[in-house]
Amino acid sequence: MLSEVIARVELLIGEQTLSGGILTFLFIVVIAHFVLTRFTVHSRFWNSQAWTGVREEWFPKMRAKVRTIGNIRQMLSDGYEGFSKQNKAFALPVIAEKPWLVLPHSCIPELLAKSDSEIDMKIIHEEQLMHEYTTGSLGRHVVDVPIQYDILLRQVNRKLPLLISAFNEELDKSFCHYWGTDTSYSEVNLSETCEKIVTQALNRIFAGKEICRDEGFLEHSRLYSEGVGRNAIMVRMLPPLLRPLLAPFITYSNRKHRDICLRVCLPVIRERVQHTAAKRADAEHKWEPPLDVLQWIIEESFARNDPKELDPRMITQRLLALNFVAIDTTHMSMAHTILDLYRSPNSDDFLVGLREECERVLQANGGQWTKSGLDDLVCVDSTIRESMRYSDLGYISLTRMVVDPKGTQFNANGTNSSSPLSVPPGIRICVPAHAIHRDAALYPSPYEFQAFRFSKAREKYRGTQTELSEPKVSIVTTTDKFLPFGHGRHACPGRFFAAQQMKLMLAYLVQNYDVEKLSTKIQNKIMVGTTKPDASLKIKVKRRKV
């Protein structure tokens, strides 16, 4: 066997013989690698932890990693029941990645109280998305100088009332296009049409009317977003030394889709930059700045007085960055909400309540959606929030990396231990969001979709003094038991915008369409913990006669 291996190596390197010295050197390298990895700080730490999903078998951790492809949620739930409920952290293996240290639910206040210099979130995001390879230097810059996200936080959230009409107009146009106006049932692909509706409607706010109605931009911005996430996984699986060599080939499609989007955006951006410059020079210039994120990015770029920021390629990259963070999560959340609502045994009752609420609120606001009107859609809000709990997209939350050179500590050594758990730098930590969302101690009947779970209290006290004193729980309310948007100071800043758009979508859908009741046997697809609707699932829809 050994001679056969040597012969293959000889053939590979083009040598006729391998000297004993080379063989000895290779042997020493292998042994040294084994010893160093076996006795490093990280190895000692992981060897001291309890593991979930690891069985007594040959190559136990390697085989456990492979099982995480389709079974990581069950492994997480097993660890939650076996360790978290005893206030003990546990290790969770992941395919092609370092393991996670999963902290118990009780550690969330501790985790949130720690400074960014002790545990860091940005490193995790960079590690997951591999911006250096997947989005290139432009993508790296828009992450380091996140003008687009600052605008989403400051401008969009503040100007939501002014954006509702434009969004609703685009919502009507895209629903009519992709779901049709036929009053007889016809089949549509749920995931595909939801994605296209969301992409067009959100880009009315992001990129403006002209770009959001360009089929090329809509298609290739969608493919770009999908490619960044998918190709990041492939790049992460490469040995670090091979990434600079192979990543450019893997991520070629990202650059192709970005360049097609640039060709669509280029004339629009150039025209806007010219008009904005003229308006800044002469307030009487006859041009009204559009009300959208693209325009606010251009204005902020002028304010920074940096020519690089006004490069159309840079501005297009910022639009694609917004699409990446917003489109996928929003369209999957909406597809899950539709699935959960229409496959529920109580769907008829839920729909009666939702339609009654929409009609009442719309009538009270003069037949137009307003910011205050959307805030009054407590049943619509609850339905989406419950779907985000019941069909949560991710399996972990509050992901951080320990960056303090001295490490950090958590009270997570078990209920019978008074000594804290010391975690060395470089270890990735998280909390088991999926298991928390399914904990019967936190949510009664957690495996049942209850559309009005979060609106019952507000409905009960509507219009009374008690309503004023009751804490208002909505989609955007993050808690230690509702974690789709994270929690604490790093909770998703775009959730206020996302919540309003999802409420408008669901309100529009239930008012204007009937969806044929779905089978309770329809299951979501789960891949390495991420839940997605079945990409091939078709549903029957028809326009309501109203």
Curated annotation (Swiss-Prot):
A GO biological process held by the record: secondary metabolic process
Protein family according to the UniProt entry: Belongs to the cytochrome P450 family.
Biotechnology remark: Pneumocandin B0 is the starting molecule for the first semisynthetic echinocandin antifungal drug, caspofungin acetate. Pneumocandin B0 is a minor fermentation product, and its industrial production was achieved by a combination of extensive mutation and medium optimization. Inactivation of three of gloP/GLP450-1, gloO/GLP450-2, and gloM/GLOXY1 generates 13 different pneumocandin analogs that lack one, two, three, or four hydroxyl groups on 4R,5R-dihydroxy-ornithine and 3S,4S-dihydroxy-homotyrosine of the parent hexapeptide.
Biological function: Cytochrome P450 monooxygenase; part of the gene cluster that mediates the biosynthesis of pneumocandins, lipohexapeptides of the echinocandin family that prevent fungal cell wall formation by non-competitive inhibition of beta-1,3-glucan synthase. The 10,12-dimethylmyristoyl side chain is synthesized by the reducing polyketide synthase gloL/GLPKS4. The thioesterase gloN/GLHYD exclusively interacts with gloL/GLPKS4 to maintain turnover of the polyketide side chain.
Binding site for heme: 492
InterPro entries, sorted: Cyt_P450, Cyt_P450_CS, Cyt_P450_E_grp-IV, Cyt_P450_sf
Entry GO CC: membrane
This enzyme's EC code(s): 1.-.-.-
Disruption-associated phenotype: Leads to the production of pneumocandin analogs with 3S-hydroxyl-L-homotyrosine.
Protein name: Cytochrome P450 monooxygenase gloP
Glycosylation sites: 189, 413, 416
Cofactor needs: heme
Subcellular location: Membrane
UniProtKB keywords: Glycoprotein, Heme, Iron, Membrane, Metal-binding, Monooxygenase, Oxidoreductase, Transmembrane, Transmembrane helix
Pathway in which this enzyme or protein is active: Mycotoxin biosynthesis
Membrane association type: Single-pass membrane protein
